[in-house]
Amino acid sequence: MQISELFSILAVVGVAAALPQATPTTPTPTSASAAATISATSSPTCXPGPVIDYTVVSGDTLTIISQRFSSGICNIADASGITNPNFLSLGQVLQVPTYVCTPDNTSCLAKEGSDTCVEGGPATHTIVAGDTFFLVAQSLGLDVNALLAANEGVDPLLLQIGDVINIPVC
């Protein structure tokens, strides 16, 4: 009787049988092939999440929203068409890229100015919604301390829409 016939008979009666298996041998990898295997299998991939609609509520900032959705301030600003990432409106609907692989938190932020005066510029600025001393100084290329010095007695934390501040002119 052949082994194959024996297995056929055992299968008919519902008995499981297994042939003895040869012990498999695994080739020992060389250092180069082991390194290639490790680097090929251990490189993480990033799959960003979907872009969602988010409605701004009281207390929201792009920093808070970006942290909530694993995004970047500038990723959200760019996707939402925001030119001033320091100013959001209640009820504003943002496009928020979620789980961004490389969050961008700097490219959309204006750099701090370094000039002490504005050459031939306006001597005053009327405060509008969203203005701060820092943002006004940034927009004019001024060092914020130069703007503060030109406005002695003005508390930068108490600015109101319509207030007029001095701009240091060269």
UniProtKB/Swiss-Prot annotation:
Subcellular location per the Swiss-Prot or TrEMBL entry: Secreted
Matches recorded under Gene3D superfamilies: LysM domain (3.10.350.10)
Pfam families: LysM
Induction: Expression is induced during the initial intracellular biotrophic phase of infection.
Annotated signal peptide: 1-18
GO cellular component: extracellular region
RNA-binding keyword on record: no
Main location: secreted
Function comment: Secreted effector that enables the plant pathogenic fungus to manipulate host defenses for successful infection. Binds chitin oligomers and polymer with high affinity and plays a dual role, not only in the suppression of chitin-triggeredimmune responses, but also in appressorium function. Does not protect fungal hyphae against plant chitinases but suppresses chitin-triggered plant immune responses.
Further facts: In plants, chitin acts as a microbe-associated molecular pattern (MAMP) that is recognized by lysin motif (LysM)-containing plant cell surface-localized pattern recognition receptors (PRRs) that activate a plethora of downstream immune responses.
Domain notes: The LysM (lysin motif) domains are small globular domains involved in binding chitin in eukaryotes. ELP1 contains 2 LysM domains.
UniProt-recorded name of the protein: Secreted LysM effector ELP1
Species per Swiss-Prot/TrEMBL record: Colletotrichum higginsianum (strain IMI 349063) (Crucifer anthracnose fungus)
